[in-house]
């Protein structure tokens, strides 16, 4: 097989809302969908726990997470890269 296999792992982009736990960040992923019956655009959000080995991501950072093997009871995602650093206020 000379063709590279396409990765079946999902990747999502979201905002870090909590970095209080060791090696773990909580990521809020928002998506906008159209309601089937009424046609209104609705914002839906989900929170994911992602593994941050070095503890380098802080609250407010926009990051990309990738699906992985289960790391703990609630952690099935790994942080892959920083998209945007948090603004300092």
From Swiss-Prot:
GO terms for molecular function: rRNA binding; structural constituent of ribosome. Keywords: Ribonucleoprotein, Ribosomal protein, RNA-binding, rRNA-binding. GO terms for biological process: translation. Gene3D superfamilies: Nucleic acid-binding proteins. It comes from the Bacteria. InterPro entries: NA-bd_OB-fold, Ribosomal_uS17, Ribosomal_uS17_bact/chlr, Ribosomal_uS17_CS. It holds the Pfam family Ribosomal_S17. GO terms for cellular component: cytosolic small ribosomal subunit. Part of the 30S ribosomal subunit. Belongs to the universal ribosomal protein uS17 family. PANTHER family: 40S RIBOSOMAL PROTEIN S11 FAMILY MEMBER, SMALL RIBOSOMAL SUBUNIT PROTEIN US17M. One of the primary rRNA binding proteins, it binds specifically to the 5'-end of 16S ribosomal RNA. HAMAP family: Ribosomal_uS17_B. This is Small ribosomal subunit protein uS17.
């Amino acid at each position: 097989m000379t063709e590279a296999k396409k990765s079946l792992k999902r990747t999502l982009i979201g905002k870090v809302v909590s970095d209080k736990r060791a090696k773990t960040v909580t990521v809020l992923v928002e998506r906008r969908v159209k309601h089937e019956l009424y046609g209104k655009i609705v914002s839906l959000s989900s929170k994911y726990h992602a593994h941050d080995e070095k503890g380098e991501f802080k609250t407010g950072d926009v990051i990309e997470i990738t699906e992985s093997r289960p790391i703990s009871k609630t952690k099935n995602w790994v942080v892959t890269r920083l998209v945007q650093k948090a603004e300092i206020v």
